[in-house]
Swiss-Prot record:
Enzyme class per UniProt: hydrolase
Organism encoding this protein: Pyrococcus abyssi (strain GE5 / Orsay)
Cellular component GO terms held in the UniProt record: cytoplasm
Keywords per UniProt: Cytoplasm, Hydrolase, Nucleotide metabolism
The protein's name: dTTP/UTP pyrophosphatase
Keyword Hydrolase: yes
Length: 187
């Protein structure tokens, strides 16, 4: 059985397209002493996977952590609408990185990696930002946006894996199979 160590409906949807999965969110302290954003994303993904693996040692565990980085500043999940507005204003007209660290545990093997996707936002008007905030789609999303939803109209271009920006790179599934992890395909 594949267990997704996340409460993210986006990750559940992506992984669930390929495999029958169970969801068991990890309850970890999401602080990290890692020096770089990539190291932080990988560290948190690994912590999530290991926490869930301790409960389900005979299953395949998939975990991920996604962060948005603009000019070296990590833009996490906003705690308020005001904070979301500030993040969107910062991202307006700029290129930023979406970094997802992932970790897979199967039969004692621990495999992790990092994917980075560049995203360029068009210039966002104050009215557009206010409208987006009113949708409440910004809640619980790194960088205050979900590319798969209303915020898709913010994007001028993307370089890299679209699903990485959503929260789980397709590469995770490919790595899972390529490395000999043999979960049952979805019927």
């Amino acid at each position: 059985m594949i267990i997704l160590a996340s409460s993210s409906p986006r990750r559940r949807e992506i992984l669930g397209k390929f495999f029958d999965i169970k969801v068991y969110p990890s309850e970890i302290d999401e602080r990290s002493n890692a020096r770089s954003p990539k190291e932080r994303a990988l560290d948190l993904a690994r912590k999530k996977a290991l926490a869930v693996h301790s409960r389900f040692p005979n299953d395949t565990i998939v975990a991920a952590d996604t962060i948005v980085v603009l000019d070296g500043e990590v833009l996490g999940k906003p705690k308020s609408e005001r904070e979301a507005r500030v993040m969107l204003e910062k991202l307006s007209g700029k290129v930023h990185s979406v970094i997802t660290g992932y970790c897979i545990i199967h039969n004692g093997k621990v495999v992790g990696g990092v994917e980075e996707t560049k995203v360029k936002f068009r210039n966002l008007s104050e009215d557009l930002i206010e409208w987006y905030l009113s949708t409440e789609e910004w809640k619980d999303k790194a960088g205050s946006y979900g590319i798969q939803g209303y915020a898709s109209i913010f994007v001028e271009w993307i370089q890299g894996d679209y699903y990485n920006v959503v929260g789980l790179p397709i590469k995770v599934v490919v790595e899972l199979i390529k490395l000999g992890f043999k979960p049952r395909p979805k019927r």
